[in-house]
Amino acid sequence: MAASLWMGDLEPYMDENFISRAFATMGETVMSVKIIRNRLTGIPAGYCFVEFADLATAEKCLHKINGKPLPGATPAKRFKLNYATYGKQPDNSPEYSLFVGDLTPDVDDGMLYEFFVKVYPSCRGGKVVLDQTGVSKGYGFVKFTDELEQKRALTECQGAVGLGCKPVRLSVAIPKASRVKPVEYSQMYSYSYNQYYQQYQNYYAQWGYDQNTGSYSYSYPQYGYTQSTMQTYEEVGDDALEDPAPQLDVTEANKEFMEQSEELYDALMDCHWQPLDTVSSEIPAMM
C-alpha cells in the first residue's frame, strides 16, 4: 500500500520534476509528487507530499535522507521531511523523548535514529540540532512511543560508544504544558522537535564543547556525569530550536535598551503635559 511523506521549506521554483530528481539523486524512487498551492493565487505554499510504493520505503527514506543537503537547491537547503497525515487523523499517541548530548559533527539524523532503533523498536525518529549554517550544535533528540524503552535507553546507553567519536550523554526531556495557538495548514506537518531548557548552565563547559568554534575538547573527566538527568522542553517547530547556553551580545542589548528608552522619552514629551515657558510661569489650572 502506497505511503506519503510531507516535505517542507520549498522554494517557488521547486516543482514536481525538481523534487523527483532530488530524491533520485539520493538513490530513492518516488511514485508521485503533489505540490500544494494557494487556492486563490495558485502560488506554491512551500510544501508538498511525496508518494512512495509502501510504508517501509517511505520510512527508510525519511530516516536516511531527512536533514541532508537537498541536491540542486539554490540557496542551499536540506531535506525537511515528516510522516504525512494527509487525509488522515493525526497520531496523538504519547511520545517520550531523550536529549542526546556530546555528539560529534559527523553524526546526522539517520545515524542518531539507527543507533537507537536497532535496540529499541519504539524509537520514532532522531533529530540533530543544526545552526544556521547547517553545522551540528553537538546535541540532538530521539523520540520513543514506549516509555519503558525510553527509560531503558537512558540507563543502557548512558556513555555508550558507537555513535560518532565520543561517548553519548543522555538525559530525559519532559514536555511542559502545550500552549494552545492556531497554526497554518502547512505547519501541521512540520518535523516538530522541541526547544529545550537546560537545567544546568555549564553543559558545554564541562563536556568540552566550544560554541564559538564548534569544536570539542577531549579533556573532560570520563563519565563525570553529575548533573540532573531531567531537562524540560516546550514544543515548537525545529526551526525555532535555540542554543541551550547562548552568549549575550552586550552591544546589541545596550542598543535595544537605548532605543526603548528613547521611545519612552518621546512618548512622555508628546503627552498632554506641556513644558513651562519660564521658571516663573504659573501652572495651569486643571480643566
From Swiss-Prot:
Domain RRM: residue ranges: 3-86, 96-175
Function of the molecule: Involved in the early steps of selenocysteine biosynthesis and tRNA(Sec) charging to the later steps resulting in the cotranslational incorporation of selenocysteine into selenoproteins. Stabilizes the SECISBP2, EEFSEC and tRNA(Sec) complex. May be involved in the methylation of tRNA(Sec). Enhances efficiency of selenoproteins synthesis.
Subunit-structure text: Component of the tRNA(Sec) complex composed at least of EEFSEC, SECISBP2, SEPHS1, SEPSECS, TRNAU1AP and tRNA(Sec). Associates with mRNP and/or polysomes. Found in a complex with tRNA(Sec). Interacts with SEPSECS.
Compartments reported by the entry: Nucleus; Cytoplasm
InterPro entries in the cross-refs: Nucleotide-bd_a/b_plait_sf, RBD_domain_sf, RRM_dom, SECp43_RRM2, TSAP1, TSAP1_C
Family matches, as PROSITE patterns: RRM
Tissues expressing the protein: Ubiquitous.
GO cellular component, as recorded: cytoplasm; nucleus
Keyword RNA-binding: yes
Keyword Membrane: no
Sample GO molecular function, one term: tRNA binding
UniProt keyword annotations, A-Z: Cytoplasm, Nucleus, Protein biosynthesis, Repeat, RNA-binding
UniProt similarity note: Belongs to the RRM TRSPAP family.
Protein name: tRNA selenocysteine 1-associated protein 1
Biological processes per GO annotation: selenocysteine incorporation
